[in-house]
């Protein structure tokens, strides 16, 4: 397997772990907890399938939720990303602080012939929220232009902010000429930049994450409620798909996608495809390869007790320490050992409620596998047998053994 104890962050290994010897039963219990929660997921096969098969993509990439590259082809090639542009449009709009539910006067905007449009024109009004939904689901180019004007007063000013934001995010192979992604000289990005953008958008803005998962959206266009279908076939057909955005130019197609299975989220991007179907086929190939080539491990469980600490404000009471979230990671079975680093409060330190206690990061062959943070709970642990810490620990040990 090449995994040296994915259960690595046992409290006995935490910094400042020079605890009294009578803490021993807790250490044994915690080791048991981690040994069980770190069992490999049966859904992820332990085979090396080589490289994924790509039929059309000139550039491709697949990463995990940490941003770790699992596979790439021409990751920094600068290629037309078409309507994937609209993810940055949404990011800039949401970061502007503009009122999503305010009503904005719309305009007649100039678009290329046959460009996808919802039908907005001067004399109509819309909320920014509805414009964003039409733009992200149906890829309405007129909606993207209206978003830009509503937020910045003009498309030009908005595009300037898009490029500034790209620089701030370190997207060094990305340049925008418009807010919608219609073909324009100098308008390009790379798969490495786009998965970074996509991961940021999906994890930072619930509106984006929830909208790109929709199969259709109904919005007012003038006085008519119009139902607009999603351009994303991937989100309708691929198990675990989350979104996020399609792209189609005059000569190439593209796709930025995300999916989640067994607690692990993947991001994939393909650029330079030649058909609408091919972009989805290649994305599926990337993700299928990742699921099958890596082993999934649960490295932290929010419901599992990690350790208990003495409560700072009440003698004899203790507070539980747990992971802040369930954390999974992908481990390459033929790679090197999985190791970890842990930074944590010294054992025995008086602890309040809902306070950070430590952070653990697992790595394999230099890549980050997963990161977990740990905090004290928001309630005191009930005392079942007097005030003794050992009695408290033994109670949890028995309860855990019975549950197992």
Task: State the predicted function of each range.
Residues 34-43:
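C-terminal segment of classical bacterial N-terminal signal peptides
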Residues 172, 183-188, 192-404:
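Domain-terminus/edge residues, biased toward the C-terminal soluble/receptor-binding domains
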Residues 5-27:
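Bacterial N-terminal signal peptides that target proteins for export
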Residues 43-206:
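Active-site-adjacent loops and short helices of periplasmic peptidoglycan-processing enzymes
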Residues 27-33:
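Sec-dependent N-terminal signal peptides
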